[in-house]
Amino acid sequence: MGVAVTVMCNDGTTANGYALKATNPSNKFLFVFHEWWGLNDYIKQTSEQLFKDLNSEVNIIAIDLYDGKVAAVRDSAKAYMSALSPERANVIIDGFLTHVGDSAQIATIGWCMGGGYSMQASLQLQQQALGCVMYYGMPESNTERLKTLQADVLMIWPNQDKWINKEVVDTFKANMVSLDKKLFVEEYNADHAFANPSNPKFDNEAATNANNKALIFLKSKFGIN
């Protein structure tokens, strides 16, 4: 359904992604950010489902932050995530921003590691950012950087998450309020990565509800019925 894409980055390197093109020409884009596993078949299938759920009206690009590497086991995933520098991620995101052009209106979504990069991308997109969905991802804690955010944020938070814990979320809420930024937090009685069917702690009911909330949020930002 989608196609592999390669774009040039401003440092002379290339970046990879998986793209689905809107049925009719559109400047609306959704940047999708993978979990620590990499841009695997699950993320591609999720991107395809998002494309359908957004009525094929939005261009979808699942961005590969690992430059082609995909992990099959946790040790590899941990190593790949640790090896990813914020600088390289910024270069990759900027490459795709240049690729879609100055007129593009872009929302972001991601899970786990990708949830954090969903927020970082929205910060990087500045006035082109439409909205940010972050599933159990680490929010930006630097208020000087956070004040530049121009997108509303939907945070999907499982309250059993030991990494993105209550302290992290409460601090993020307080920072967003102090900066007069819009944050919507959907809390679930679930654990980290509850939305991924391959996770032993997958919660189908919570995942379905969270997906519906994410779609309502994204459709409102894209102006889709």
Question: What do these predicted regions represent?
Answer:
Residues 3-101, 198:
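Serine-hydrolase catalytic machinery in alpha/beta-hydrolase-like enzymes
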Residues 45-46, 165-175:
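Short alpha-helix in the alpha/beta-hydrolase fold that links the catalytic acid
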Residues 101-111:
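Alpha/beta-hydrolase fold nucleophile elbow
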Residues 110-114, 118:
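Gly/Ala-rich beta-loop-alpha elbow adjacent to hydrolase catalytic centers
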Residues 128-138:
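A conserved short beta-strand
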Residues 149, 155-157:
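Short beta-strand/loop motif that positions the catalytic acidic residue
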Residues 160-164:
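Acidic catalytic loop of the alpha/beta-hydrolase fold
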Residues 179-225:
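C-terminal catalytic histidine-bearing segment of alpha/beta-hydrolase fold enzymes
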